[in-house]
């Protein structure tokens, strides 16, 4: 009986853990969305384009399975909590 109860507890914990999904902000539209299975990190990528001096940096937000490789001229931040990739002063459009 104890073994059966222990087995049920373990199965319950595993099932609850597998069902969890991360939520991250996405760029278009700027709102939190549930990430696809296996993508448990949020990222914020920013860089300058031709309009950087007038509009500021281009910002891309989303979910990822692993943090993208940093490329020259791009800033990348990854985090592992829900909605951790926010951008200050952005409003939903």
Swiss-Prot record:
Name of the protein in question: Long neurotoxin 2
CC terms in the record's Gene Ontology section: extracellular region
Summary of the tissues where the protein is detected: Expressed by the venom gland.
Organism: Hydrophis hardwickii (Hardwick's spine-bellied seasnake)
Domain of life: Eukaryota
Disulfide partners: 24-42, 35-63, 48-52, 67-78, 79-84
Positions of transmembrane segments: none
Major localization class: secreted
Protein location: Secreted
Keyword Transferase: no
Function: Binds with high affinity to muscular (alpha-1/CHRNA1) and neuronal (alpha-7/CHRNA7) nicotinic acetylcholine receptor (nAChR) and inhibits acetylcholine from binding to the receptor, thereby impairing neuromuscular and neuronal transmission.
Alphabetical list of SUPFAM superfamilies matching this protein: Snake toxin-like
Signal peptide: 1-21
Family statement drawn from the similarity comment of this UniProt entry: Belongs to the three-finger toxin family. Long-chain subfamily. Type II alpha-neurotoxin sub-subfamily.
Keyword check for Secreted: yes
Recorded GO MF terms: acetylcholine receptor inhibitor activity; ion channel regulator activity; toxin activity
Keywords in alphabetical order: Acetylcholine receptor inhibiting toxin, Disulfide bond, Ion channel impairing toxin, Neurotoxin, Postsynaptic neurotoxin, Secreted, Signal, Toxin
A Pfam family it matches: Toxin_cobra-type
